[in-house]
């Protein structure tokens, strides 16, 4: 074929993507003889357009998947769509489209965009969680978990999003607001379905220790969320001796610092008292309109209601503590009741200051032992016990143990463990989700849908003209016969939290299309996922739920593994500076897209009027700030390989990547440099073997392989740049021609279209396979991985003056003679003999003139 002088990226992209598809190049192989590599990026929500964060995420996974194919692995690298969720319903309400049609159109658009990147994906494994063949199997698994006692239904206070009109899990409440709508979350009592994740709290916590290929930060986040706390549980008595309520504390050492007792607004005692107190009832109602997360309550103003009741201090019955209902105690942690120790807990201190309650110091780090504590910040550090009777002089740990021992001996309390983790509420009052497969019968109660009647599919004829769940209002869908008595009954109209959908999709991918949720034998071959890639924002939600789901299925005997993801990588975000103008006092800035702005050395101006705009800081790309870059536009301009190269090259993959025109331009120029180099594979010239270049080539082969294995893509890119530089400087030789040909294979995982084009142009004798997609990674010669030459620094009076390359291990006399013969050193000495020469073999020669 005639070779173009410039690489035509767009034509090559289209040509090779078509060729790979025709050859089924990336179909999953399962020889049973090769090691397996299951590479998976977190599947996307089909919003309609991919963004640069997607591009970076999938480029990383693709490089690893292609590399694993080249190194002799059976590779599973699938793609699918996390396709249920509220945005589709919002589109239905705003645009009058059906959620299913909107979602499937978005999937088609995003699939086409992803294919433009040249991803080595087995598209035959594609799935969408909104299709009955997926969610029907999810319903079957849900019934299996129910049969095993891991699913239950109860009435409880839930996090209610008043805008989206649905329930949120605790993990979906961020700073007291719904994670999607941003609305302040309220508390509401509803009948809900729960998964018993708390049954697995201990093993989920202990299992983190085996995940040595997960980021420490993610493991710590999960550990804190599971929240194992050991402490004392005891029961207060009302003044007079009648039982009052139980309390759990992790700080029994501070009992002598107590100045009040507090209960949650949702505590049974608070609700009982509210029946006879309109003021307390109003206070409780106000608390429930506030946020529900621990984070929001931490920062909110501390409010309380004095019940007028008092309880006896457990260590001194004559010491009475007032009982308050407070807004910062959660019913779903511990017992929903505490004792307040203001001197050593900031929330209690803020509350005590507001309501003028006593503040008693019981821990001191130094000489300050006065009982009355006057500081504005609670002391939470180490120290010894003071003002605490029999505990005085003990360390905190000693005092904790002493109080628990006394409580157990006297029978008023016991040492116990509680968990921050709560059971997973999975009910959602939405249409676009997996229908929960249960039926409510007046005679038989709540009964499961028989598996023979699965899937329970969503009706298409739904009305989104008013907020709420359209399934509740559907005239026929929810009316069914009871599967037990055949009498009139109602379907469950709640749907499952979409995080259920993503808790097992990796199992379905491995099994390909099947009439079961998955094939246990296939799962035994492919799971766990060898490399999982996605954002750290999923550390608690998705990743914890997937771990629970895997362990639950293991408990049911359906799979052998306990952990779904052997190795986890959390990539950084793609960021961009913002461009804006102020709109006036009290108004948000007016933002502009990068296409609307001309960037110069002194700032930026709006193209439309030439006037300046404010250049903001570099932040995550977002539609609201308009600092997004359209991948399609960049692909149209530079082609897939330049985009992939830039995504991999400019920053360590775990860090954020600032988008820049200079960066993508540099990637494009390097693509063209390589294209020119690849045209010189037959130019052997008159030169013989180039040992230095051969060594550089084989060191690069080994180094790039190690970097890709470790997901150090930027390091691999740097090594390839360095090798290209050496090849360009080298004289024509057989070694140089070989290096050019091997370089094609080294860049193939990152620049697959360029590599295919260059591979095809090679002489047939140099090609081991018709396409580079099927080629093997080049072998590095171990003998060439060790340098037999070193670069020596030559100093004069300690200052660097020259360098020289010499044989490794050269003796001191040879190094001194070589250094003194260097033209630069001869010039600097001016014919004079040096006073002294200090030689450090293989490192430096220091000449003292």
From Swiss-Prot:
Q: Where is this motif: 'HIGH' region?
A: 44-54
Q: Its Gene Ontology biological processes?
A: leucyl-tRNA aminoacylation
What organism is listed for this UniProt entry?
A: Sphingopyxis alaskensis (strain DSM 13593 / LMG 18877 / RB2256)
Q: Which subcellular locations apply to this protein?
A: Cytoplasm
Give the CDD domains listed for this entry: Anticodon_Ia_Leu_BEm, LeuRS_core
Gene name of the encoded protein? leuS
Its protein name is: Leucine--tRNA ligase
Q: Name one GO cellular component term.
A: cytosol
Q: Where is this motif: 'KMSKS' region?
A: 620-624
EC number(s) in its UniProt entry?
6.1.1.4
Looking up Gene3D superfamilies in the UniProt record yields: 2.20.28.290, 3.10.20.590, HUPs, Isoleucyl-tRNA Synthetase, Domain 1
Tell me the Pfam families matching this sequence: Anticodon_1, tRNA-synt_1, tRNA-synt_1_2, tRNA-synt_1g
Q: Answer whether the UniProt record assigns the keyword Heme to this protein.
A: no
**SUPFAM superfamilies given for it?**
Anticodon-binding domain of a subclass of class I aminoacyl-tRNA synthetases (SSF47323), Nucleotidylyl transferase (SSF52374), ValRS/IleRS/LeuRS editing domain (SSF50677)
